[in-house]
A protein has these predicted regions:
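A solvent-exposed beta-alpha-beta segment
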Residues: 1-71, 339-352
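Flexible phosphate-sensing "switch/lid" loops adjacent to ATP/NTP-binding sites
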Residues: 67-69, 117-118, 130, 137-381, ...
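Conserved glycine(s) of the Walker
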Residues: 126-127
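Intrinsically disordered, low-complexity terminal tails and inter-domain linkers enriched
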Residues: 436-449
Length: 452
């Protein structure tokens, strides 16, 4: 049995269990993501050993499933959870009679034919996305064409989403993606990047590497990369510095990292930054440690002054990511909003359920939109919240997906390198020693020629 959340679990099955005569997978379980339990992993992806596919059941039924399906092994396969959470699940599996297993990189990472740079994080919401965008821009400046491969988010038709390629914004509509997927893909597409994602990452890898000088793995949650990285960059949030040593598999990617970015130093206290340095130094004393900021940009931000505002934040960050707020809340404070209106008492349906499931979420609205009904409930929650204005802290253009009955402003944020060593330095050293050195030199010379 594979204990999952519609991502890592499917990958682990595809690369380690599919076609493996030593195992027969009797079920997946689902957590974190709504509307996954009750479905089936399709035969088209499961292979000939599974003519009826594989059922996906609620994690809450773990003990009953292990005993009823006579599962010998429970394989933990999702991310962004505390070490304690993992061991509670282990105890549940063991008490039901099953072994408990974690699969490591040797069994789950695929080898690419082109260099791979992976961006991962200690926790969801640390700043992977803007780091990925910055790395892609630095590569492009050097004449190196990156193709981004994103950690899976197969929340629709699993078989149809086996291999997805996004090159223009209209591809998002073509693939019927959720708000959560748009949050990741839209900023990359606006920057001119090609993005691959889906379910079957062996097929995705072979497609993506055909059009890339380098593959740029854009991690999800705090998970390990699915491809063997030639350079692993892990982002740490100093607001949750101690989490780097207490969350799975974030601690793993901190320990594995070649470079560690301590992000958000512009909003963290000196004590928080010092704690982050101490923690990552203890876990990985050999990594290059970089400091970076996440400056916030709000077009027309002055309109927030003295207004009562509703803040909509990136959903994963303020739910299983454990942050009470995000960039939208910071922007509302910075631009002197009169009040950040608490939406929790106005929430309806699954949005209300989300607050119950994640009581650590602060007085902000997670941009949950895993299906049409949830998007409607999100819109209704916004309508019911008595505010003058909506502050959109999620990266997606929410106004195009949800009918807003209030004026809105969007918050944007990018990675800003601070001091030495820098991400530019780390990337430059990597390129000098990789097969990309010649292309990098030609690209740098061309850039210098343009600037002169």
């Amino acid at each position: 049995m594979i204990i999952g959340a519609a991502g890592r679990d499917f990958h682990n099955f595809n690369v380690h269990f599919r076609g493996n005569q030593a195992y027969h997978v009797v079920a997946f379980t689902a957590a974190q993501i709504p509307n996954i339990a009750g479905r089936r992993y399709p035969t088209a992806l499961a292979g000939p050993g599974y003519p009826d596919g594989i059922p996906i059941e609620p994690e809450a039924d773990l003990e009953r499933l292990i005993q009823g399906l006579h599962a010998d092994v429970a394989v933990f396969s999702y991310s962004d959870v505390s070490h304690e959470h993992v061991m509670h699940l282990a105890s549940r599996a063991l008490s039901a009679g099953a072994d408990f297993l974690l699969l490591g990189p040797r069994h789950t990472m695929l080898k690419a034919r082109v260099p791979v740079i992976a961006v991962c994080a200690a926790r969801t919401g640390s700043g992977k996305s803007q780091t990925t965008r910055r790395v892609a821009a630095l590569l492009e400046e050097r004449g190196i064409h990156p193709v981004v491969v994103r950690h899976p988010m197969p929340y629709g038709d699993i078989a149809q989403q086996a291999v997805q390629r996004f090159a223009v914004l209209s591809d998002l509509d073509h693939h019927h993606v959720t708000i959560e997927e748009r949050e990741e893909y839209e900023p990359l597409l606006r920057a001119g990047r090609v993005v691959y994602a889906g379910v079957d990452y062996e097929r995705i890898l072979r497609e993506a590497e055909r059009e890339a000088d380098v593959l740029l793995w854009d991690g999800g949650n705090n998970d390990m990369p699915f491809f063997v990285p030639d350079l692993l960059i892990t982002v740490v949030d100093p607001h949750r510095a101690d989490h780097a040593a207490h969350y799975h598999p974030g601690e793993t990617v901190v320990r594995m990292a070649d470079a560690i970015i301590i992000n958000k130093v512009d909003t963290a206290s000196p004590a928080e930054i010092a704690t982050a340095r101490r923690v990552v130094g203890e876990l990985n004393p050999h990594a290059t440690v970089i400091e970076a900021a996440s400056p916030i940009f709000v077009e027309g931000g002055a309109v927030l002054r003295h207004k009562r505002v509703l803040v909509v934040e990136d959903g994963p960050t303020v739910t299983h990511g454990g942050m009470p707020y995000g960039a939208g809340w910071v922007a509302a404070k910075r631009y002197e909003a009169a009040e950040i209106v608490d939406p929790r008492s106005h929430a309806v349906g699954s949005i209300r359920d989300t607050y119950a499931a994640y009581p650590g979420t602060g007085p902000v609205l997670p941009a949950m939109g895993y299906g049409e009904e949830q998007v409607r409930e999100l819109a209704e929650t916004i309508r019911r919240t008595p505010a003058d204005l909506v502050v959109i802290g999620t990266p997606v253009d929410l106004g195009k997906l949800v009918k807003l009955d209030k004026p809105s402003v969007r918050v944007r944020y990018e990675l800003e390198e601070l001091g030495e060593p820098s991400l530019t330095d780390v990337l430059g050293r990597f390129l000098e020693t990789s097969a990309l050195a010649e292309a990098s030199t030609q690209g740098t010379q061309a850039q210098a020629s343009v600037e002169s």
